Amino acid sequence: MNDAPSTVGMIIFMTALGLLPFIIVTMTAFLKISVVMFIIRNAIGLQQTPPTLVLYSIALILTVFVSLPLMEDISNRLSARPLDVSSLDKLQASANVVKEPVKAHLMRYAKPGEREFFLSATARIWPPATRANVKDDDFIILLPAFVSSELTRAFEIGFLLFLPFLVIDIIVSNILMAMGMMMVSPTLISLPLKLFLFVAVDGWSRLMHGLILSYG
């Protein structure tokens, strides 16, 4: 019987470990940062460079940097009240300690309009008994609102990043057509120009700085 708490704790730890990728992708800056990174790679025209693993690693590093205050807050709360898995009630009490900073984080970056939509959507797709006590600060509302808000911001940034590279593609294509060089692939000419532009404006630094400061 003495091994029961440790067994329960191990099960909870393994479950939390399995959910960690889901938590990182849906509750942190990783979602927006990774999407922007892939958009800029496609905008330049480099299909495999930087490699996908490198882009995910950059996104993860920047996510840790941005989320450090949140992680520190959670760590301090758990230090003040260590996680207790000896019973479900104590486990729930410990989880409530962590819940507040995470909820505040999601509230900060989830657009009010998205929260209102998902709250109103419950009236259309949930039965009355299920939606009776739902509020706009519940996780079931905050999480999809946060994901939708982050994706919207990511594509807004991606659109602005795409424009100058699109202009280069159009100019190069028109010049080649005017010169009668239709057999020459525009990518052969535009890719070095886009790389030069990105390097000349210190693209990676500016991109990462902007993504980090967007959470200020």
Language-model segments: which ranges?
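Hydrophobic alpha-helical segments and their helix-loop boundaries in membrane
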Residues: 1-216
